[in-house]
Amino acid sequence: MFDESDLVYSKEHEWVFIDDDIAWVGITKYAVKKLGDIVYIDLPSQDALIVQGECVGEIESTKSVSEIYSPVSGRVIAVNEDVISSPGLLNSDSSVWLFKAECENIPELMDWGQYSEYTKE
């Protein structure tokens, strides 16, 4: 759905696609690979106010449970119900979005090149 070069990335391994003042948020291939098979996901509710850097949900895999941190501040305007009912979608397609938020200010995040360097092992 999204090309990696069109996205920006957080240090907590969320990706963001910016469309005017709307941010589409997902988790990166790198995070999905580290997590393994994803079996459960908890996301913020629609209309929730979110703050950049704060925990907004949880993702559970066969290996671990991790928190989801919001890469943006604003109001959640949509939640991807498909990924809640079928969290394994993230294992087959990391471009699956988690939630959309209307943002007041878009923060400085890493571009694809910076994120690639950040995740180099």
From Swiss-Prot:
GO cellular component: cytoplasm; glycine cleavage complex
Cofactor section: (R)-lipoate
Residue positions, PTM N6-lipoyllysine: K63
Protein's job: The glycine cleavage system catalyzes the degradation of glycine. The H protein shuttles the methylamine group of glycine from the P protein to the T protein.
NCBIfam families the record matches: PRK01202.1 (NF002270)
Family, as annotated: Belongs to the GcvH family.
The protein, known as: Glycine cleavage system H protein
Organism for this UniProt entry: Tropheryma whipplei (strain Twist) (Whipple's bacillus)
Name of the encoding gene: gcvH
